[in-house]
C-alpha cells in the first residue's frame, strides 16, 4: 500500500502532463492554419523569403520538440509498465516470503519439539546407564558374596538382569533409529532453511533493485518536470517570436504601401517624361515638314519668277535642282555623322550608366543609419530654408542646382555629377566598415537612382535639336523659342524637393526596419542555439544516467554472483560439519557398545 501511495503522485503528474500535452497539441493545431495563411501571404510578398524561412525553421523545431515529447511519453509509459510488473513481482515475492516465514516458524517449532525429545532420550539413556552400572555393581557384590557365603544360584539372579539388559538394548536400538530419523529430519530442515535463506537474499536483492528503480524513477520524473518547464519556456518564446513576426509583417505591409505610393508618384513623373519625348518627336516631324514646305515654296517662287522673265534671264531648273540636291546630300551626310556620334555617345552613356549603377549598389549596401540620418537632416534644413531648391545626398555627394534670374532651375552638367558620384563612392567605400542588406531597399533605391541619373541626361536631345536647327539655317527667333521650350522641359523634368525628401525618409525607415529585422533574426538564432545547447546537455545527461544504470546493474549482478558463491561455500562447510559430527557420534556409539559387550562377557 505504501508503494502504491508513493507512485500515485507520479501518475497524477503524468496525467497532468498528458492534459498539458493535449492542450499544447490543440493549440499547435489551431495555430497551423494561421501559419498556412501567413505562408500564403508571404509567398505573395516580394523580398520576405528570410522571414518565411525563419518561420519554417521554427515550425520544424517545434515539430522536433513534439516528437521528442512523444518519445519521452512513450518511454514514461514503458517505465510505468515495467514499474507495475516490478510491483507485481515484489508483491509475489512478499507473499512467498510470508509463506516461507510461516514454514520456518513451523520448522522451528518442530525442531524445538524434537530437541526436547532428544533431551528426554538422553536423560533416559543416562538413567539406563546408571541402572546398568548399578546392576553391574550389584553383580560384582553378588559374586563376591557367593565366594564368601553360600548364596542362591547366580542364574536366578542374572535372569532378571539379562531381561532388563535386553529391554535396555531394545530401547537403545529404538533410540538409535529415532536419532537417525531425527538426523534425516534435521538435514531436510537445514536444506529447507538454506533454500529459504536463498529466497530471502534474492528477495532482498530484488527489493534493493526496486528501491533503486524507484529512486531512478523519481529522478526521471524530476527531469521530465524540468523538460516540461523548458518546453513551456520554448512555447512562450515561440509565441513571442510569432508576435514579433506578425508585427514585422504589418510594418512590411505599411512600408510596401508607402513604397507603392512613392512608385505611383514616380510613374506619374515617367508618364510626363514620356509625353515630353513624344511632343519633342512631333516637333521634329513638324520642323521637317516646314523645311520641305519651304523648299517647295522656293521652287514654286522660282517657277513663277521665270514665267515673266526672258529666255536669257531664266534660271535652268536643272542647275537649281542639282544645287538643292547637293545641299540636301550635305545635310544628309551631316545628319548621318550626327547619328553615328549620337550612337557612340549612347553606347558610352550606357556603359557609364552600368558602371554608376554598380557603384550605387555598392554605396547603398555600404551606407548605414548614421549617414542616412545626417543626409536627411541636411536635406530637410536646405528645403526649409531655400524653398524650391533641393539637395541630393547620394553617399555624401551633393548636387545642388543653380538658380537663374527667371527663377528656373539649371542643373549641373553630367560630367560634374559623375565626378562627384565617383568621389563620394570612393570615400564611402574607404570609410564603410559593415554592410546591412535589406530585403528590397537596394533595388528600390536603384530605381530612384536611375530616375535621378536619367533626369539631367534629358538635356542632350535638346542641345542636338538646337544644333540641327542652326545647321539647317533657320531663323534666330525659332532657335530662341526652342531654347525656351528646352528650359521649360528641363524645369518640368526636375523632381520636386518635397517628393525627394519623402522618398528619402521612406528609404531611411526601410533601412531601419531592415536593421531591426536583422537584429531580431540574430536574437532568434541565438535563442535557438541556446535551446540546442540545452537539448544537447539533456541528451548527454540521459546518456550518463543510462551508463550509470548499466554499471549499477553489472555491479548488482557481480554481487549476486558473489552471494551465490558464498552461499555455496557455507553449504559445503555445513555438510562437512554434519558429516564430521555424524562420524564422531558413530565412533562413540561403537566404543560404548564394544565396552558393554566386554563387560557382559567378563561378567559371564
From Swiss-Prot:
Pfam families: MAP70 (PF07058). It comes from the Eukaryota. InterPro entries: MAP70. The keyword ATP-binding does not apply. Residues 233-470 are annotated as: Required for targeting to microtubules. GO terms for biological process: cytoskeleton organization. GO terms for molecular function: microtubule binding. It is found in: Cytoplasm, Cytoskeleton. One of its GO terms (cellular component) is microtubule. Keywords: Coiled coil, Cytoplasm, Cytoskeleton, Microtubule. Residues 49-351, 521-569 form a coiled coil. Signal peptide: none annotated. Residues 401-422, 468-478 have a biased composition (Polar residues). Residues 1-33, 367-422, 434-495 are annotated as: Disordered. Plant-specific protein that interact with microtubules. This is Microtubule-associated protein 70-4. It comes from Arabidopsis thaliana.
Amino acid at each position: 500500500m505504501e508503494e502504491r501511495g508513493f507512485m500515485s503522485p507520479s501518475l497524477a503528474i503524468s496525467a497532468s502532463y498528458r492534459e498539458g500535452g493535449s492542450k499544447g497539441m490543440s493549440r499547435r493545431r489551431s495555430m497551423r492554419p494561421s501559419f498556412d495563411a501567413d505562408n500564403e501571404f508571404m509567398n505573395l510578398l516580394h523580398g520576405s523569403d528570410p522571414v518565411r524561412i525563419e518561420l519554417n525553421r521554427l515550425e520544424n523545431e517545434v515539430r522536433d520538440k513534439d516528437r521528442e515529447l512523444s518519445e519521452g511519453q512513450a518511454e514514461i509509459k514503458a517505465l510505468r509498465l515495467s514499474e507495475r510488473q516490478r510491483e507485481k513481482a515484489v508483491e509475489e515475492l512478499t507473499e512467498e516470503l510470508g509463506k516461507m516465514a510461516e514454514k520456518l516458524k513451523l520448522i522451528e517449532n518442530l525442531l524445538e519439539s524434537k530437541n526436547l525429545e532428544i533431551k528426554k532420550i538422553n536423560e533416559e539413556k543416562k538413567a539406563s546407564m546408571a541402572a546398568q552400572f548399578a546392576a553391574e555393581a550389584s553383580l560384582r557384590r553378588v559374586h563376591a558374596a557367593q565366594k564368601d557365603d553360600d548364596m542362591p544360584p547366580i542364574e536366578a539372579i542374572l535372569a532378571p538382569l539379562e531381561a532388563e539388559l535386553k529391554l535396555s538394548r531394545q530401547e537403545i536400538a529404538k533410540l538409535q533409529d529415532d536419532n537417525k530419523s531425527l538426523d534425516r529430519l534435521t538435514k531436510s530442515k537445514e536444506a529447507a532453511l538454506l533454500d529459504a535463506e536463498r529466497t530471502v537474499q534474492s528477495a532482498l536483492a530484488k527489493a534493493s533493485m526496486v528501491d533503486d528503480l524507484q529512486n531512478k524513477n523519481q529522478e526521471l520524473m524530476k527531469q521530465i518536470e524540468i523538460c516540461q518547464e523548458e518546453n513551456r519556456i520554448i512555447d512562450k518564446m515561440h509565441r513571442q517570436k510569432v508576435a514579433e513576426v506578425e508585427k514585422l509583417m504589418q510594418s512590411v505591409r505599411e512600408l510596401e504601401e508607402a513604397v507603392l505610393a512613392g512608385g505611383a508618384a514616380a510613374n506619374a513623373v515617367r508618364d510626363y517624361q514620356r509625353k515630353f519625348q513624344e511632343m519633342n518627336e512631333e516637333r521634329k516631324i513638324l520642323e521637317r515638314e516646314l523645311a520641305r514646305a519651304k523648299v517647295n515654296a522656293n521652287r514654286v517662287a522660282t517657277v513663277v519668277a521665270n514665267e515673266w522673265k526672258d529666255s536669257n534671264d531664266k534660271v535652268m531648273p536643272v542647275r537649281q535642282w542639282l544645287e538643292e540636291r547637293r545641299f540636301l546630300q550635305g545635310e544628309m551626310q551631316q545628319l548621318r555623322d550626327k547619328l553615328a556620334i549620337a550612337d557612340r555617345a549612347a553606347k558610352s552613356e550606357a556603359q557609364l550608366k552600368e558602371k554608376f549603377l554598380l557603384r550605387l549598389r555598392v554605396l547603398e549596401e555600404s551606407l548605414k543609419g548614421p549617414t542616412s540620418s545626417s543626409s536627411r537632416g541636411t536635406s530637410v534644413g536646405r528645403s526649409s530654408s531655400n524653398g524650391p531648391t533641393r539637395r541630393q545626398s547620394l553617399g555624401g555627394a551633393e548636387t545642388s542646382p543653380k538658380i537663374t534670374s527667371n527663377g528656373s532651375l539649371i542643373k549641373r552638367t553630367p560630367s560634374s555629377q559623375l565626378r562627384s558620384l565617383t568621389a563620394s563612392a570612393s570615400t564611402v567605400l574607404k570609410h564603410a566598415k559593415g554592410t546591412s542588406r535589406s530585403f528590397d531597399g537596394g533595388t528600390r533605391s536603384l530605381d530612384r537612382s536611375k530616375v535621378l541619373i536619367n533626369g539631367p541626361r534629358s538635356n542632350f536631345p535638346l542641345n542636338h535639336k538646337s544644333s540641327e536647327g542652326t545647321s539647317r539655317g533657320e531663323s534666330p527667333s525659332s532657335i530662341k523659342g526652342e531654347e525656351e521650350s528646352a528650359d521649360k522641359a528641363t524645369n518640368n523634368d526636375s523632381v520636386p524637393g518635397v517628393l525627394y525628401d519623402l522618398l528619402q525618409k521612406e528609404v531611411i525607415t526601410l533601412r531601419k526596419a531592415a536593421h531591426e529585422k536583422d537584429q531580431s533574426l540574430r536574437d532568434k538564432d541565438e535563442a535557438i542555439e541556446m535551446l540546442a545547447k540545452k537539448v544537447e546537455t539533456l541528451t548527454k545527461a540521459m546518456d550518463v544516467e543510462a551508463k550509470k544504470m548499466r554499471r549499477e546493474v553489472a555491479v548488482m549482478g557481480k554481487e549476486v554472483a558473489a552471494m551465490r558463491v558464498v552461499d555455496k561455500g557455507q553449504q559445503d562447510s555445513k555438510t562437512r560439519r554434519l558429516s564430521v559430527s555424524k562420524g564422531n557420534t558413530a565412533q562413540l556409539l561403537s566404543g560404548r557398545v564394544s565396552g558393554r559387550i566386554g563387560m557382559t562377557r567378563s561378567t559371564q
